[in-house]
């Protein structure tokens, strides 16, 4: 059966924030093939290390599928931290083991599910950083990958004086328009997916205030 989700009283919660790849990339207790991976984070030795620290909850920096910004790609660099989301319903494949990557998306997803299950069995709550304030499509000079091609005017906020001008409250080139119910539904559906299908216990919203900012005010 599925392990029960730990429920730590807020007064006793100790959150440890980590990057799946960065935290395990040089872990001496892991075999090389597990370093930098979801499976490496789920390894008993990794979980034992975290237990020894006395933390109760693990906050994962973004693990939703990402794509680096164009200006980074042009310099042969990547957005290491993952705050450039491409797939809100998909885990980032580059953090999976080589075996899972070669097996395909289903195997990558299963590796994430197994990681969360192992954390629960070890007594940890699992929190995930999520980025709904902007997408990887960046500003006007950015690529058309998904939302811009589907319905540019509906998904992204615009300035009042010029509908063609993106209203950038994030400093990342665009801002998703949460005054549009379709955008809100999309975000909630993806959160529900991660909670119900993957097993995530909670979420930390990047630049949360921008999600409800309207005409310069938080509503």
Enumerate the predicted regions with their spans.
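The feature marks proteins involved in alpha-glucan
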Residues: 1-17, 24-37
């Amino acid at each position: 059966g599925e392990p029960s989700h730990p429920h730590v009283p807020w007064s006793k919660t100790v959150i440890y924030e980590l990057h799946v790849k960065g935290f395990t990339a040089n872990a001496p207790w892991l075999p090389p093939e597990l370093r930098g991976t979801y499976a490496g984070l789920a390894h008993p030795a990794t979980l034992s290390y975290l237990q020894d620290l006395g933390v109760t909850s693990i906050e994962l920096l973004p693990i939703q599928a990402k794509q680096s910004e164009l200006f980074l790609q042009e310099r042969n660099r990547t957005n290491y931290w993952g705050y450039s989301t491409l797939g809100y319903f998909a885990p980032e494949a580059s953090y999976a083991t080589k075996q899972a990557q070669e097996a395909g998306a289903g195997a990558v997803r299963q590796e994430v599910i197994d990681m969360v299950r192992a954390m629960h069995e070890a007594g940890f709550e699992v929190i995930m950083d999520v980025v709904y304030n902007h997408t990887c499509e960046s500003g006007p000079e950015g690529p058309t990958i998904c939302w811009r091609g589907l319905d540019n005017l509906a998904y992204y906020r615009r300035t009042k004086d010029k509908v063609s001008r993106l209203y950038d409250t994030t400093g990342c080139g665009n801002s998703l328009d949460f005054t549009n119910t379709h955008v809100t539904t999309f975000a909630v559906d993806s959160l529900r997916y991660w909670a119900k299908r993957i097993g995530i216990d909670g979420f930390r919203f990047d630049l949360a205030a921008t999600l409800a900012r309207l005409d310069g005010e938080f509503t």
